């Protein structure tokens, strides 16, 4: 079942990326979603208070991680300004964004419940599930950005967004490795089966909501492309009509 779901995600998201890059509004939607994700990562997740008792080595790494997420947000904000000319963010993609926001809220709520439920299974408490979620979300980010880099490198190698994504992808790969090392450092041998079960539950939440997000991407890309085409057709007709 998971293999079929992964196949569907891949077959849906690549065409969605191509459709979204067919219009400036579509690319702006993608960049805005990335920007919001990076800003969320910079502020840390809703379970940040549970990390208040993190050991010094972990707190220092979290500070560095947050600084890099802030840099990613600045890169995406710069690209968004170039696309939108710093106009109001309310545009044709607004309805699509609200759909993605709803998916994100559902995912965050499910993950927050998981942190609370899993914490008693580990000597380090909520630190372990919170960092395990960070690890798996970073791994998801690596897949998202790697897919996008691959699509642009093949279809639009001169796209201004490509070097931005390449920088972010390199950092996300490093973040994923660091998160995994941090989690493994916090658990003992007896807790490793519980950690494996926790990771499977995290991945299950991501897979379940990932299909919905992919379909929203594809639908939004198609709608924005159709809207842009209709506008171009209307403009040509107006220009060709007798004065």
Regions found by a protein language model. Name each.
Residues 1-243:
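Non-heme di-metal
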């Amino acid at each position: 079942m998971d293999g079929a779901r992964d196949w569907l995600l891949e077959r849906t998201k690549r065409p969605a990326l191509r459709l979204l890059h067919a219009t400036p509004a579509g690319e702006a939607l993608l960049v805005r979603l990335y920007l919001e994700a990076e800003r969320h990562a910079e502020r840390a997740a809703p379970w940040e208070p549970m990390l208040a008792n993190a050991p010094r080595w972990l707190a220092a790494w979290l500070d560095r991680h947050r600084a890099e997420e802030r840099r990613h947000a600045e890169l995406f904000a710069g690209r968004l300004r170039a696309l939108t000319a710093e106009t109001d963010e309310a545009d044709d993609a607004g309805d699509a964004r609200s759909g993605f926001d709803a998916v994100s809220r559902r995912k965050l709520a499910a993950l927050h419940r998981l942190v609370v439920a899993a914490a008693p299974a580990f000597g380090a408490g909520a630190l372990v599930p919170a960092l395990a979620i960070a690890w798996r979300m970073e791994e998801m980010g690596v897949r998202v950005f790697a897919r996008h880099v691959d699509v642009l490198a093949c279809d639009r190698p001169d796209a201004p967004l490509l070097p931005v994504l390449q920088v972010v992808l390199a950092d996300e790969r490093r973040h994923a490795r660091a998160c995994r090392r941090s989690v493994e450092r916090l658990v003992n041998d007896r807790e490793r089966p519980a950690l494996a079960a926790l990771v499977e539950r995290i991945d299950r939440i991501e897979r379940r909501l990932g299909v919905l997000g992919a379909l929203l991407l594809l639908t939004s890309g198609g709608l924005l492309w159709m809207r842009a085409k209709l506008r171009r057709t209307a403009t040509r007709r107006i220009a060709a009509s007798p004065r």
